[in-house]
From Swiss-Prot:
Keyword Membrane assigned: no
UniProt gene name: moaC
NCBIfam families assigned: PRK12343.1
Protein name in UniProt: Probable cyclic pyranopterin monophosphate synthase
Pathway(s) per entry: Cofactor biosynthesis; molybdopterin biosynthesis
Length: 150
């Protein structure tokens, strides 16, 4: 957060609180691409496991990507995947005990995992002109945010 003068918010007087945030988002893909992911037949490797690692890395590096985000201690990152007929849904939950929220880390985790999925399967998604008519990322949002006094 920033104050009205454009400075990073001073959180030094805030209490340390247990916090959790969960975000979700989807990437829509061709049915054939979903089948390739399910059968671990993507050239670049295991899409789910690599995307789990990328999502975790994005969560941990949020403060480096968003200038006014605080560098907070991340105590947990859980990245889950659900494959539908024409989509992969990524859900990321992040936890901390700190003075500010952890929802940006959860959102960043989802975005990183989704971007990685796109990168890994783009050769399967391109049409004859090199475009991606069916591929899209949608619905990235926070579905739950909690905090409780320790």
């Amino acid at each position: 957060m920033i104050d009205f003068d454009g400075n990073m918010i001073n959180i030094s007087r805030k209490d340390v609180v247990a916090r959790k945030a969960t975000a979700v988002g989807r990437i829509y893909l061709r049915k054939e691409t979903i089948t390739a992911i399910k059968n671990n037949q993507v050239k670049k490797g295991n899409v789910i496991e690599i995307s789990r690692a990328v999502g975790t890395m994005y969560a941990k590096n949020t403060f480096l990507q968003i200038p006014y985000c605080h560098n907070i201690p991340i105590e947990g990152v859980d990245v889950d995947f659900s494959l539908g007929e024409n989509y992969v849904e990524v859900t990321c939950s992040t936890t901390t005990s700190y003075k500010t929220g952890i929802e940006m880390e959860a959102i960043n985790c989802v975005n990183g995992a989704l971007l990685n999925i796109w990168d890994m399967v783009k050769y399967l998604e391109k049409d004859e002109t090199g475009n991606y008519p069916e591929t899209r990322i949608e619905g990235v949002h926070v579905i739950k945010k909690t905090k409780s006094q320790e």
